[in-house]
Amino acid sequence: MSEWKIRFGTAGTSDSFTAMGYKNSLDIPAYTEKMGLDAFEYQCGHGVRLGLDKARQMADDAAARGILFSVHAPYYISASSLDEEKRLNSVNYLLQSAALCRALGGRRVIFHSGSCGRQSREAALEKALDTLKRAQDALDEAGFAEITLCPETMGKIGQLGTLEEVLALCGVDRRITPCIDFGHLNARTLGGIRSKADYAAILDRIGEALGDERARQFHVHFSRIEYSKGGEKRHWTFAETQFGPEPQPLMELLAERGLAPVIICESAGTQAEDAKTMKRFFEVCLCTTSQSGLRPPAPLVGGAFGIKRKLHPAAKASPTRGGGIPKG
């Protein structure tokens, strides 16, 4: 799996996993392949509990089937906490997640940065930037330099995780890659993603801030999400069309621009089925783009989407830095 390509997969397993007779984590690669998908995000929201030996078994099976794992780190990471001990613990949770990710043959660890709490957004971001720098240093020192940290955009307004905050975090090191959760962004902006142009503005901003490679190979979470005045309230399925955002305009843009993210569906109970729907949307869009005579753009250089904006000063990279789980 040396060649990078667009992938579609799930966060955890759909209700259909057990309905189809699959029983435990060792069955995940077979199930993922059966559903026509080629990515899987192993959920460690409540702690890194999967044994490394079992993870290596899963990795061998996944590699044979062309499936790429990623890992979602524990939810209780708090890179922005006022409590320094919690911030240091967050570094350890990321190290544990990186060890599991490597055992699974994966490349990416996705994580939530934390909340603002009783401090300003600016102060919370400063702490998160420092924690992330410590985490990247710790990964390098522990021999996990190939594992990519992916801070996620968040759905609740009180959480650290606007698009700009995540892009600032990615400025800590050129390897750090954003996890853009479009459902979360739609929820925290109270329905701000209404059109293809809204998606395009987000993609443009990623390219403007991060340049070519990360703008092309970023990480995606997608689901329809109900929201209230505080932002995210509940994940739904693609069948609940009263909740946004719509997936098809995003698939059109990915095809037209030649982008290749890993797309992880987080629908409630139908994530595999809905991921397959997105894959079909994308394949149709890709075919339409080809038949129309349009060609996806060549790889972009940094800043090609527009004028470069100045990154948060604490997010400047060091010049020495490089570029529902089943039981058991």
Predicted regions and their residues:
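Conserved, mostly hydrophobic/aromatic
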Residues: 32, 72, 90, 101, ...
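Active-site acidic/histidine proton-transfer and metal-coordination neighborhood
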Residues: 63, 80-180, 187
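Glycine-biased, low-complexity coil/linker segments
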Residues: 302-303, 321-324
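Conserved beta-strand positions in the central sheet of alpha/beta enzyme cores
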Residues: 41, 70, 110, 179, ...
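N-terminal pre-domain/capping segments
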Residues: 1-73, 77-98
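Gly/Pro-rich active-site loop or hairpin
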Residues: 19-22, 122, 160-164, 186-260
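Active-site beta-loop-alpha junctions enriched in small/polar residues
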Residues: 11-15, 43-47, 74-78, 114-116, ...
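Acidic (Asp/Glu)-rich catalytic clusters
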Residues: 2-3, 29-34, 50-70, 96-105, ...
